[in-house]
């Protein structure tokens, strides 16, 4: 993969043209390239990653293998009931069934064949866990933190996370890292962790101009981009 700063130099013919470099587009590009297609990604912005890179980037998919590994059961019909409750008059039974039947299978591919790896906090509840079909955990997962140096020079073109999602310019991982920051002045272990994290952030900014410990949606966008790089998928920016 190479990142191009314009639409110049596009190949004359490809098998798949992907419009947009968020998670959906890049996952499509990586999957198609993995199966032998010649792919090109076109992005209108001057950075790749789309909304995914700027967001939390969590996935909500019931019945995932990660949940099973944690010993969390998915009651029969509960996810369908929850979606119906949340969607109200917009509920689509056929689409919901397709999502529930294929969602778990879809997320088995990235950890096996790409740089994308997921973690699942045991106690991350549905937004309305008390609603019909809601669960206290086992449906939400997040991309494992990623070292931005693995992207090489391409990290300069990765869209940053929203400032509202950062602390002192740092993207914090969910779970233990957030707990350390909230307990920094109540726990010596947390204070040491936060101090080391701040020093690492300062070093990264001096060396690379930005923090390179990538988390949440930024980590997902970066891992997908690294996977595309490995498969020689070009990304063209500023394509309008």
Regions from the PLM with identified roles:
Residues 1-16, 34, 222:
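Extreme N-terminal leader/targeting segments of oxidoreductases
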Residues 3-5, 44-234:
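Conserved N-terminal/central alpha/beta ligand/cofactor-binding core
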Residues 12-14, 35-38, 55-56, 231:
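Short coil/turn connectors at secondary-structure junctions
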Residues 14-15, 34-37, 209-211, 218:
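Short linear motifs at secondary-structure transitions and domain/linker junctions
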Residues 16-41:
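N-terminal Rossmann-like FAD-binding beta1-loop-alpha1 element of flavoenzymes
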Residues 237-240:
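A conserved short coil-to-beta-strand element within the FAD-binding core of flavoproteins
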């Amino acid at each position: 993969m190479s990142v191009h700063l314009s639409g110049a130099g596009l190949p004359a013919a490809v098998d798949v043209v992907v419009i947009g470099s968020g998670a959906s587009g890049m996952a499509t590009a990586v999957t198609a390239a993995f199966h032998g297609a010649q792919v090109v990604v076109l992005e209108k912005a001057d950075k790749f990653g789309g909304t995914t890179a700027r967001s939390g980037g969590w996935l909500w998919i019931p019945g995932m293998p990660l949940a099973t590994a944690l010993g969390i059961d998915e009651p029969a019909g509960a996810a369908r009931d929850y979606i119906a409750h949340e969607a109200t008059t917009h509920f689509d039974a056929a689409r919901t069934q397709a999502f529930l039947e294929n969602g778990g299978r879809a997320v088995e591919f990235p950890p096996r064949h790409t740089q994308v790896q997921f973690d699942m906090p045991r106690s991350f509840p549905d937004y309305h866990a008390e609603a019909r079909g809601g669960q206290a955990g086992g449906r939400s997962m997040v991309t494992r933190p990623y070292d931005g140096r693995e992207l090489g020079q391409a990290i300069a073109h990765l869209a940053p996370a929203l400032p509202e999602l950062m602390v002192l310019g740092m993207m914090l991982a969910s779970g233990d890292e957030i707990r350390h920051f909230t307990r920094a002045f109540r726990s010596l272990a947390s204070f040491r962790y936060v101090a080391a994290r701040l020093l690492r952030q300062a070093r990264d900014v001096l060396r690379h101009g930005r923090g390179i410990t990538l988390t949440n949606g930024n980590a997902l966008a970066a891992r997908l981009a690294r996977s595309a790089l490995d498969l020689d998928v070009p990304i063209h920016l500023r394509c309008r």
